Amino acid sequence: MAKGKRTFQPNNRRRARVHGFRLRMRNSGRAIVSGRRRKGRRALSA
């Protein structure tokens, strides 16, 4: 029986475009970043 491919295929450009800081600075993403700042997260976004 054939196995499917792995679901995580790393790609830095896609990672930045989907989860990056510039994206978080748009609209409601700001709330996410401010919450992570308040919590003291080392990384705010990808």
Curated annotation (Swiss-Prot):
Q: Does the keyword Transcription regulation apply?
A: no
| GO cellular component, as recorded | ribonucleoprotein complex; ribosome
User: Which domain of life, per UniProt?
Assistant: Bacteria
Q: What biological process terms from GO does the record include?
A: translation
Q: Does the keyword Oxidoreductase apply?
A: no
Matching Gene3D superfamilies: 1.10.287.3980
The Gene Ontology terms for molecular function here are: structural constituent of ribosome
Q: Which InterPro entries match?
A: Ribosomal_bL34, Ribosomal_bL34_CS
Keywords, alphabetical: Ribonucleoprotein, Ribosomal protein
Membership in a protein family: Belongs to the bacterial ribosomal protein bL34 family.
This protein's name: Large ribosomal subunit protein bL34
Give the organism the record lists.
Mycobacterium avium
